């Protein structure tokens, strides 16, 4: 549809990165998205400027378009990131809401030349062995909290993340959610959560600084990812680029990834619970992509219990990765990997 609105028309304000401004802007942008969707679809435009924002919900028929020199900068506060039961690393678990969520939506897009910044540096722990001594010392000007492990010391951005590591409350009940609430930022979200969506386009935008994974399409159909950039620092814990889980008809091309973990990853659930649901990751075409940094360039698994099949990867360049092509498995996962062409 031709309908186009600017978030400024709905009262959004740029240049102020305070939490209250982020909440105000999120209300304005979500209202614009809702109205455009209800009127049959169209474009919600983010003009040039830095816009503080709280979590957003993308609805059917809406293209969230970021102009050149536009940035959505997500604030972080407990009130804006309630806990929920969702899927992460192949199984149901507790996480906070994501900065951007779409669920059961059709004909949606995030396009343009701007930047989505998830403020992941306020969420992510950092392992000491990944830092220089000077970098490590600088972290303590932000937070004094450190978790000592057999492997390495791990810096924590907040006390609640440190306590969350000690308690590690898990489960899929209301009681578990309530018990975990004081440690909300231990349960880091993926930045872009696309669940059970159809006809999805990600084009041109830079996705960066995610709390955990950058982009997580889950049981989506007809997904196109083109000309995007995904950027996380090399030390970003769980800083995956895109994790395509149990999706079908996927086209990823002419995109650049710099990540702290796997870059372009195919997944399909974890262990016996996942195998009860049909949904392999299938019919995926990946080409003309550049991975400058990451654990793996093109990766399958290790959550692949529903299977991964019919994948073609060609004309991609993996530079500075730990492993260019990474097939990960784990005892008991099950699942069949077949018809993979590189």
Model segments located where?
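Extracellular/periplasmic carbohydrate-active domains that bind, remodel
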Residues: 1-342
């Amino acid at each position: 549809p031709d309908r186009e609105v600017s978030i400024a028309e709905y009262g959004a304000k740029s240049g102020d990165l305070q939490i209250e401004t982020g909440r105000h802007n999120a209300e304005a942008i979500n209202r614009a998205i809702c109205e455009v969707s209800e009127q049959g679809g169209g474009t919600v435009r983010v003009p040039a400027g830095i816009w503080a924002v709280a979590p957003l919900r993308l609805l059917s028929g809406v293209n969230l378009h970021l102009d050149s020199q536009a940035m959505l900068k997500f604030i972080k506060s407990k009130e804006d990131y309630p806990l929920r039961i969702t899927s992460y690393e192949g199984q149901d678990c507790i996480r906070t809401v994501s900065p951007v969520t779409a669920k059961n939506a059709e004909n949606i897009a995030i396009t343009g030349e701007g930047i989505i910044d998830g403020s992941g540096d306020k969420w992510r722990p950092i392992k000491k062995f990944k830092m220089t001594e000077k970098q490590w010392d600088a972290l303590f000007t932000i937070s004094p909290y450190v978790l000592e492990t057999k492997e390495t010391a791990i810096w924590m951005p907040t006390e609640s993340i440190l306590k969350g590591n000690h308690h590690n409350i898990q489960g899929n009940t209301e009681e578990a959610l309530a018990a975990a609430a004081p440690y909300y930022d231990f349960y880091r979200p993926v930045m872009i959560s696309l669940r059970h969506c159809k006809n999805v386009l990600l084009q041109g935008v830079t996705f960066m600084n995610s709390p955990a994974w950058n982009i997580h399409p889950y049981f989506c159909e007809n997904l196109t990812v083109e000309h995007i950039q995904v950027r996380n620092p090399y030390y970003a814990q769980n800083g995956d680029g895109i994790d395509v889980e149990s999706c079908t008809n996927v086209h990823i091309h002419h995109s650049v990834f710099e990540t702290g973990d796997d870059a372009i990853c195919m997944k399909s659930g974890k262990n016996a619970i996942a195998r009860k649901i049909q949904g392999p990751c299938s019919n995926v075409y990946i080409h003309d992509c550049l991975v400058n940094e990451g654990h793996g360039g093109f990766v399958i698994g290790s959550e692949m219990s529903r299977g991964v099949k019919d994948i073609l990867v060609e004309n991609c360049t993996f530079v500075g990765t730990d492993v260019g092509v990474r097939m990960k498995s784990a005892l008991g996962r099950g699942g069949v990997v077949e018809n993979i062409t590189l």
